[in-house]
């Protein structure tokens, strides 16, 4: 939303290889290009906002601590953070419901956003949390995970795929308090009568 005059902005392809760029664009729905912000000739400041109405969380990465994040939650990162597009959770969409996850590793800072507030849970070793996939934002790569259907056939037919992720610690899990699907469904209850009346 704003930046200091000392900030130099340069645009480049997000990945070094064309295949990596295409993979991140098609599967992750991220842009081909990314802006690099560098302070030149003195200190500088840059402010970012997220598209959804919600919080922005700052995650610190190290060689022994990375994160698995929802593709749409990515906002920005420092240069030494690597976004892995070859990870199976990204290339195969293991989380279902169009939910592709990106594995972030390296040394640096990662900024993620949520729809609604961020609810952080710290899991001890062996402790498990079951999370609705539409509310899952990120979790530590030290965690184990398993995606499965929730409920019976009736719930699946009425509620969609009905997938949840079981995340087992040790590590942190970040959950968003709102989800876009529920917002769209609610908006449609308001818009549907008008659409139908105009279609007659």
Report each predicted region and the residues it spans.
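Composition-driven recognition of glycine/serine/threonine/acidic- and proline-rich low-complexity segments
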Residues: 1-200
